[in-house]
Amino acid sequence: MTKTTDTNKRPRRRQILLGTSFFLVGGLVLSGCAAGTTSSSSSATTGTSTSTSAAGDVTVAQAATEVTESDSSTTAETITNTTVAVEALLATLSDEQRAAVTYDYDDETKTTSWSNFPVTFVDRAGLNVADLTEEQQVAALQVLEALLSDDAYKAASNIIASDQYLADSSSSSDADILGQYYIAFFGDATDTSAYEVQFGGHHLGINATLDGTADAITFAPTHLGVQPADWTTEDGTEVQAFDGIYTDAFAFYNSLTAEQQETLTSGEVTMCAPGDTCEFTTGSGLMGSDLTDEQRELLLDLIANWSGMADEESAAATRAEIEATLDDTVIAWSGETTYDMTQGDGINFSISGPNVYVGFQAQPGSAGADIDGVVTSGWGHVHTIYRDPTNDYANSVEQQAATGMGGGGAPGGAPGDGGPDGN
């Protein structure tokens, strides 16, 4: 595929890759997309409620284009800007909404309220962004903008836009829940102690812990997914939410010798699902110690798509931690060996080491979400997971076993379909 490059500096108001006629409401998953789900509801503070329409006329995808930029180059700036954005959102909410969106920092709910399964399969924490007013929706997306780098916010926005395109254009019976996203805060938003921002739905599950005292940010664990991975808006703009990841993955693969590629592709791709306690087994494959300096940098560039989603300083700090144990990290790959989304069924890989776990898997099916002329499986339907065996949730809680369908199905497939079990 041809990579679309944005050569313009970001304008004061965000311009995301979706047409002005595009609308969004919210949510999808990592290995288990499921058709034929039914909506559920529960209490305002602990359960998921699905929405068929937003409180206003603006959808989540539209709100993502309405935020204003708040550039950060240091960890401290990101924490401060995100804290200000959280406070601004809370100021727009009612007392009941504020109670629903906030949790104690050490509440174990944070470990089971994100998933690669739809919002009707796994309860999300906090508020359904689709239920908010236009002002509140924009304020919620402003939190995400303040937290993320330009590239990461663009990728997240295009994941959201792709979900809405799927809802509007596909044969999915789940159109009413596609595009539904939730936002929650664990701990008090402040730049002097730790708190977590949780934002996600089906193909997005961001867990960012910001600690002003330690001057640190971690995105472990986080789920990024996309369906479809390549589509065109009504005004002719091509949207490829995962092009950066695909490009980095194949830059690494193509840097390897034939012998290294053979070791890589003969290895065991391991998978660890959201909501899974995970043993983080490394499996077999190519060792980090067998890479050249250039290859190591390319691998770290690939990992940074998950681990380095905030400012340059925090991204560099996490990169250094991962690099310190890269010799003991195992990489495995299966599937296609050429970046051509018109051929084959996509790629799968895992990167597993003492300080990093990344699982990437192309989904073998569309989960009933088919669009004429658009690939919605394989290359076009991907679930990924990023975790840190030493620092998930900044060690604020221990991962709890998922309820519902959060554990066994991701990212290899829904339970019972023969996919990896996530352990």
Task: Say what each PLM segment does.
Residues 2-37:
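Secretory targeting and sorting signals
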Residues 53-95, 99-130, 138-149, 154-423:
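A cross-kingdom marker for long, charged
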